[in-house]
């Protein structure tokens, strides 16, 4: 049962200012000093901070692709189910008002791109906690898949904290507000996907798509901020 449905996105459907209040004191894990304490990253250049965030997003996307492949290979004839599920417009984050393509992302501000990455990262933290629990119920699941999903679950908060620092560094604002408001959406599994393994695969596949968006948005931000060239 997906007991978490309709719950884990609730916090996302607040103003971005409210989201910011909840993470105001967060710092990126990569900013630990030798003693293990956190710094404010004030000595780290914007370019390096963007590079770190991009590297996180690239790895998340790569690991998500590998996880999808492992899942498909170990659930024959699951490849047929997975191929069908790829075509379903049933991802849990489909209700978020975010750029849906690179061309759309090119039309929005830096603030909105940062907002979009942060919301995407936050939206997947709880589903991966759920996924860790449900994967534990499988009898013959490859250890590599368990390790990869755990790695993603551990890295998402790190990327979240890094985006918070980028927001401070790039926008020079202690509080960010936008007109982003949405009502709570009741998240339901697609009626076409009734098998629990297919639903779990859908989570992995949807995250793969969103991880690619995170990577794309961050690379566009770096192009705008660092290269100052034509980013189209």
Swiss-Prot record:
- The highest taxon in the source lineage is Eukaryota
- Look up the record and give one Gene Ontology term from the biological process aspect: positive regulation of receptor signaling pathway via JAK-STAT
Which residues bear sugar attachments? 147
Check the record and name the Pfam families matching this protein: Hormone_1
Gene Ontology MF terms in the entry: growth hormone activity; growth hormone receptor binding
Q: Which family does it belong to?
A: Belongs to the somatotropin/prolactin family.
Q: What is this protein called?
A: Somatolactin
State the UniProt keywords alphabetically.
Disulfide bond, Glycoprotein, Hormone, Secreted, Signal
What span is annotated as the signal peptide, if there is one? 1-16
Enumerate the PANTHER family for this protein.
Answer: SOMATOLACTIN ALPHA ISOFORM X1-RELATED (PTHR11417:SF3), SOMATOTROPIN,PROLACTIN (PTHR11417)
Q: What species is given as this protein's source?
A: Protopterus annectens (African lungfish)
For this protein, the record's InterPro entries field holds: 4_helix_cytokine-like_core, Somatotropin/Prolactin, Somatotropin_CS
Q: In which tissues is it expressed?
A: Pituitary gland.
What are the subcellular locations of this protein?
Answer: Secreted
- List the disulfide bonds in this chain: 31-41, 91-206, 223-231
Cellular component terms (Gene Ontology): extracellular space
